[in-house]
Amino acid sequence: MALDLLRSSLGFLTTLPVKGDVDVLRRNLWVFSFVGIFIGSVISIPAVLGFWFLCVLLYVAIEGVNHIDGLADFGDAFFAPEERKKVAIKDLNLGTGGAVFLCVYFLILFYSFQRVSAFYIIFSQVLAKFSMLLLLTTSKPAWQGMTGFMMEFARKRDVVIGSLPLLLVVLKPLAVFPLLFAITISLLVKRYAEEKFGGVSGDVVGASNCLVFAGSLLVCYFLAD
């Protein structure tokens, strides 16, 4: 069971060539936050070795572009007229809003990786995955699809267990600031999605992951010694 969950979570949340059972994953959504520790640790390796400029490339390589694509679609919907927001977030073409979101996103990553420590990179990635968990367990699907399928067995237990990696904050008390920021952004994205789309979609969940990751890194950037 544990090995199946490990394979399923890594296969779903990373580009690693492992096969798993998505049914196992959707019954154990709490694992998202723990996968964040793994992804963050891998991303932080170049920074520890002094090659911080490789962090962005490694991040894209290990996490893929699904969440980034979600951020772009969310950006298009955010800037779209009220009556076209649902159409915009489903549109496969990149619009101006999405391009703006992507440019700002990668600029934040590029500059943040120069200064933040490995701990904050890992913690920011944990917060990003916890954000995804929070949306999947506390909201409703905007329409039928993979997101609704993943949310079918979401329980409060997932949030409780998924919160355990957040205890990393005790190692660096200042980490409470990116933690509070991440929760705030997650709740704002959730509220926005429910008002504009009637719930969350895969793009919304992916966008929340990116927004929280970049935002938390930016907060950590200003906290850096």
From Swiss-Prot:
Membrane topology label: Multi-pass membrane protein
GO molecular function terms listed in the Swiss-Prot or TrEMBL record: adenosylcobinamide-GDP ribazoletransferase activity; cobalamin 5'-phosphate synthase activity
This protein's GO CC annotations: plasma membrane
EC code: 2.7.8.26
Co-factor requirement: Mg(2+)
Location, primary (coarse class): membrane
BP terms from Gene Ontology: cobalamin biosynthetic process
Keywords: Cell membrane, Cobalamin biosynthesis, Magnesium, Membrane, Transferase, Transmembrane, Transmembrane helix
InterPro entries documented for this protein: CobS (IPR003805)
Membership in a protein family: Belongs to the CobS family.
Function in brief: Joins adenosylcobinamide-GDP and alpha-ribazole to generate adenosylcobalamin (Ado-cobalamin). Also synthesizes adenosylcobalamin 5'-phosphate from adenosylcobinamide-GDP and alpha-ribazole 5'-phosphate.
Protein name: Adenosylcobinamide-GDP ribazoletransferase
Protein species of origin: Archaeoglobus fulgidus (strain ATCC 49558 / DSM 4304 / JCM 9628 / NBRC 100126 / VC-16)
Encoding gene per record: cobS1
